[in-house]
Design a protein with these regions (language model features):
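Active-site-adjacent beta-strand/loop module that shapes the phosphate/pyrophosphate-binding cleft
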Residues: 59, 65-101, 112-122
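Nucleotide phosphate-binding site architecture
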Residues: 16, 37, 104
């Protein structure tokens, strides 16, 4: 089973999303991240992937949601920026800060939709 870490950064009511690189279908918006390497925790993978993909130093905190399907375990890891760093995509993808609301962002990938619903409901209370 494939294990994937997705980084969740919420700042000022907005959530960081990244587009999938053109060479990695399906296309759409997702929480940035990637596959865990052998022996790596989801937090370590989230930190490594954001550095590789977005040249962004973050501090990984806790796993706030986990989604299991027959093919994948997806860990959503809360992260905060390290210092004054900002994301700068370096693998051809785009990023955007999406306002947190009950509506899914247009083009959001299916596996991320359940988590989007979870965080939008959790933060609206």
């Amino acid at each position: 089973m494939m294990k994937v870490a997705a980084a969740v950064c919420i700042q000022n009511g907005k959530v960081l999303l990244a587009s999938r690189p053109e060479n990695k279908p399906p296309s759409g918006w997702e929480f940035p991240g990637g596959k865990l390497e052998p022996g790596e925790t989801p937090q370590q993978a989230a930190k490594r992937e954001l550095l590789e993909e977005l040249n962004w130093e973050v501090l990984p905190l806790d796993i706030i949601y986990q989604l299991k399907t027959p093919k994948i375990t997806l860990y959503f890891v809360r992260v905060i920026p390290a210092g004054n760093s900002t994301p700068a995509p370096c693998e051809g993808q785009q990023i955007k800060w999406e306002t947190l609301s009950p509506e899914f962002p247009c083009g959001m990938l299916e596996n991320d939709r359940n988590f989007w619903k979870f965080i939008s409901l959790s933060t609206s209370r």
